[in-house]
Amino acid sequence: MDYLWIMIGSALGGAARFWVTGFVAEQTGGIFPWGTVLINVSGSFLIGFFGSLTGAEGRFVVGESARLFVMIGLCGGFTTFSSFSLQTLNLMRQGEMIRAGGNIALSVVFCLLAVWLGHVVAVAINQMKGA
């Protein structure tokens, strides 16, 4: 049954990624892969937040299937290291070394910050009294 939850989460995450990247490309002109940056940063926040909120010391108890659905399925289908890599390679092949370097720097720094921030927010919620 876990595989089914992972597959459903992956399908939803992939569909959301397709929509968000297309929407962002329309808004920004597609000169820089802002959609992929947004996807990976927000997905990093979500996995850090949900993982810490529902982990062993988390405030919310959810079943392992729910964690698999969100963390492996949804986040796995939503975020995309392969698209980031291909877009960076294409920028490099086009001679856009500054943009390629910017994509690498933005993605790595902001994704690490986002996963940390998601964890910090979840820890703060976990430590709240009541509720």
Curated annotation (Swiss-Prot):
The chain crosses the membrane at residues 4-24, 30-50, 68-88, 104-124. One of its GO terms (biological process) is cellular detoxification of fluoride. The keyword Metal-binding applies. GO terms for cellular component: plasma membrane. Keywords: Cell inner membrane, Cell membrane, Ion channel, Ion transport, Membrane, Metal-binding, Sodium, Transmembrane, Transmembrane helix, Transport. Na(+) binds at G76, T79. It catalyses: fluoride(in) = fluoride(out). GO terms for molecular function: fluoride channel activity; metal ion binding. The keyword Transport applies. It is a multi-pass membrane protein. It is found in: Cell inner membrane. InterPro entries: FluC (IPR003691). Na(+) is not transported, but it plays an essential structural role and its presence is essential for fluoride channel function. Belongs to the fluoride channel Fluc/FEX (TC 1.A.43) family. Fluoride-specific ion channel. Important for reducing fluoride concentration in the cell, thus reducing its toxicity. NCBIfam families: crcB (TIGR00494), PRK14206.1 (NF010802). This is Fluoride-specific ion channel FluC.
